[in-house]
């Protein structure tokens, strides 16, 4: 963190669960892994070193409500990308009020970038609005 050549750090849905040995077959552990990682950074007193850096969250673990889990860390998270809102919506899945925001678990179908947008565009937009509301509440 003290290297001045590093100005952007990515926290992935792959590398953090992998570091904790919970990258597969354990959605609850995976869902909580980045929160656990952020808490460890805080406990180790590493956040002051992060203030001069930008942190990017790659993807979402098991649902959009992971955003709410990070509510205490918004000063450190610069950006967060995910196709979850659009991809779930286009496939007929609506984010919900369950603990993760996806009561049936993460939609695992690989994103098809040549997908033809059809009837579910409204649902995709609703999911985007759901995420925006989470972000503004954080």
Please tell me what each predicted stretch does:
Residues 11-13, 57-59, 84:
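A cross-domain feature marking catalytic cores of carbohydrate-active enzymes
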Residues 1-52:
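Conserved alpha/beta-domain cores
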Residues 39-55, 63-138:
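Alpha/beta catalytic cores of nucleotide-metabolism and tRNA/nucleoside-modifying enzymes
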């Amino acid at each position: 963190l003290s290297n001045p050549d590093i100005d952007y750090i990515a926290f992935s849905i792959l590398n953090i669960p992998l570091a904790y040995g919970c990258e597969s077959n354990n959605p609850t552990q995976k869902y909580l892994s980045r929160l656990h990682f952020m808490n460890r950074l805080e406990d180790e007193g590493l956040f002051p070193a992060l203030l001069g850096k930008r942190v990017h969250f790659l993807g979402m673990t098991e649902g959009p409500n992971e955003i709410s889990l990070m509510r205490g860390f918004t000063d450190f998270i610069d950006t967060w990308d995910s196709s979850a809102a659009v991809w779930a919506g286009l496939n007929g899945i609506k984010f919900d009020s369950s603990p993760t925001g996806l009561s049936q678990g993460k939609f695992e179908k690989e994103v098809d970038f040549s997908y033809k947008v059809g009837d579910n565009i409204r649902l995709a937009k609703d999911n985007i609005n759901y995420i925006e509301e989470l972000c503004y509440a954080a």
